[in-house]
Amino acid sequence: MREPLERFMEKVNFSGDCWEWGAARQKKGYGQFRAGTMRQAHRWFWEQTVGPVPEGLELDHTCKNRACVNPIHLEPVTHEENIRRADSPS
């Protein structure tokens, strides 16, 4: 059986600045990845490459691409900040 990270990497398109998730997605466009349980792909990959998301924070896609899993395009922010950024123009 292959390791979760190996399976994950096979599902990512690394051809651009955004590392686009190429497998299952939620209705809102976030990638989904099963590693024991179903997880948001960007959050799972962040935890594997950067570490835990600080308690009380969530990951904002600074690139505005919900399918992106590139850790450089993710920033831990409060829920309120994430909502504020979502409502602002790119």
Predicted regions and their residues:
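Conserved recognition-core residues within compact binding domains
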Residues: M1-S90
